Amino acid sequence: MKAGIIGAMEPEVAILKEKLTDAKSTEHAGYTFHQGQLDGSDVVIVQSGIGKVAAALATAILIDRFQVDYVVNTGSAGGFDASLKVGDIVVSSEVRYHDVDLTAFGYEIGQLPANPAAFMPHDDLVAAAKKGIEQLSQTAGENIKAVTGLITTGDTFMTKEEDVAKARANFPTMAAVEMEGAAIAQACLQLKTPFVVIRSLSDIAGKESPHTFEEYLETAAVNSSQLVLNMLGQLKGKVLSAA
């Protein structure tokens, strides 16, 4: 199988790009797609840029032009689970938009017309991520906690208390918030491609400043990149089950 790996920012994909073998790059529509192998697994890596539109466009090209079999969205996120700390990991059990509201027309909060309220990752990808986390905890030399939970997406970096309070009220089980995952998931659904979103926490939403986000982004990038490598190892030589 060929994996498509998407990160929004350069630090979120830099480690994986450095480890590519048999690498070649292709420019298309303003994106650079890096093809090659990671520990013997065929991959295509792209830095999408920040936000929903950029992420959806990069995903569509990745799937349609490079024919990847599944998509892994890796990177950083703000934590909403009080039991988690910077560097801990959230694997998507579902992904939703937190900045969409068409409830006046009978839709659930976060739901777009002709789409589900929640985008569901592939079970095999979630299972591989969980096994990869076990490996990461054993090799990282620190206690990295991981949960499987709701990840929400919107074009907002949450530092305002009113934004945090609204998100908590609308999505009380939310474990993490970021700016690309649901858009990637929507593109994957449209193009019938399995996905999973994996995020390492770089800050705690509503409590930390952008300065703290930048300070801890490297930690999050290291952990999420290693998890992707572990996950690829778990999936090597396997075929995903029917969704």
Swiss-Prot record:
Pfam families: PNP_UDP_1. Keywords: Amino-acid biosynthesis, Hydrolase, Methionine biosynthesis. GO terms for biological process: L-methionine salvage from methylthioadenosine; L-methionine salvage from S-adenosylmethionine; nucleoside catabolic process. It catalyses: S-adenosyl-L-homocysteine + H2O = S-(5-deoxy-D-ribos-5-yl)-L-homocysteine + adenine; S-methyl-5'-thioadenosine + H2O = 5-(methylsulfanyl)-D-ribose + adenine; 5'-deoxyadenosine + H2O = 5-deoxy-D-ribose + adenine. The active site is at E12, D203. Substrate binds at G78, M158, M179, E180. PANTHER family: 5'-METHYLTHIOADENOSINE/S-ADENOSYLHOMOCYSTEINE NUCLEOSIDASE, 5'-METHYLTHIOADENOSINE_S-ADENOSYLHOMOCYSTEINE NUCLEOSIDASE. Catalyzes the irreversible cleavage of the glycosidic bond in both 5'-methylthioadenosine (MTA) and S-adenosylhomocysteine (SAH/AdoHcy) to adenine and the corresponding thioribose, 5'-methylthioribose and S-ribosylhomocysteine, respectively. Also cleaves 5'-deoxyadenosine, a toxic by-product of radical S-adenosylmethionine (SAM) enzymes, into 5-deoxyribose and adenine. This is 5'-methylthioadenosine/S-adenosylhomocysteine nucleosidase.
